[in-house]
Amino acid sequence: MALRLEDKKAIVAEVNEAAKGALSAVVADSRGVTVGDMTGLRKTARESGVYIKVVRNTLVKRAVEGTDFECLSETFTGPTLIAFSNEHPGAAARLLKDFAKAQGNFEIKAAAFEGELIPASDIDRLAKLPTYEEALAQFMMTMKEASAGKFVRTLAALRDQKEAA
């Protein structure tokens, strides 16, 4: 079904608005995925703070012009699904990577983070970024281990002083 010019402009504006507020983007080929599976993916995406849209290539190229995701323009071939992470940079990559494992015919093409194109082979780099809570927990564990080590060294120095006296 052909889209009217007003509809095309609305789609471009919607995707452009999503791109401006996004931290990262992932492009995938959804050819062969059933409607039920796509509906499940969209539901999971909403819960994860990820915006997903299947858009015509010409429209998505216009939508990402002037954004950090312009580097993805070369990947807009064939059926294009674009996912923007709004809350965490790795959310869309993690979501689509897990979905691709479950679906044999779902292929991730590329991703973008801070204006850098990330090929599909390196998608793990983005998917494995810790969430804010995970990063905070890692930091606290580092601080805890550092203070425990300092405490042990202080006790060892105190023991050495008492032995010397």
Swiss-Prot record:
It comes from the Bacteria. Belongs to the universal ribosomal protein uL10 family. InterPro entries: Ribosomal_uL10 (IPR001790), Ribosomal_uL10-like_sf (IPR043141), Ribosomal_uL10_bac (IPR022973), Ribosomal_uL10_bac_type (IPR047865), Ribosomal_uL10_CS_bac (IPR002363). SUPFAM superfamilies: Ribosomal protein L10-like. Forms part of the ribosomal stalk, playing a central role in the interaction of the ribosome with GTP-bound translation factors. GO terms for cellular component: large ribosomal subunit. One of its GO terms (molecular function) is large ribosomal subunit rRNA binding. Keywords: Ribonucleoprotein, Ribosomal protein, RNA-binding, rRNA-binding. Part of the ribosomal stalk of the 50S ribosomal subunit. The N-terminus interacts with L11 and the large rRNA to form the base of the stalk. The C-terminus forms an elongated spine to which L12 dimers bind in a sequential fashion forming a multimeric L10(L12)X complex. This is Large ribosomal subunit protein uL10. The gene is rplJ. It comes from Shewanella loihica (strain ATCC BAA-1088 / PV-4). PROSITE patterns: RIBOSOMAL_L10. The lineage of its organism: Bacteria, Pseudomonadati, Pseudomonadota, Gammaproteobacteria, Alteromonadales. GO terms for biological process: translation.
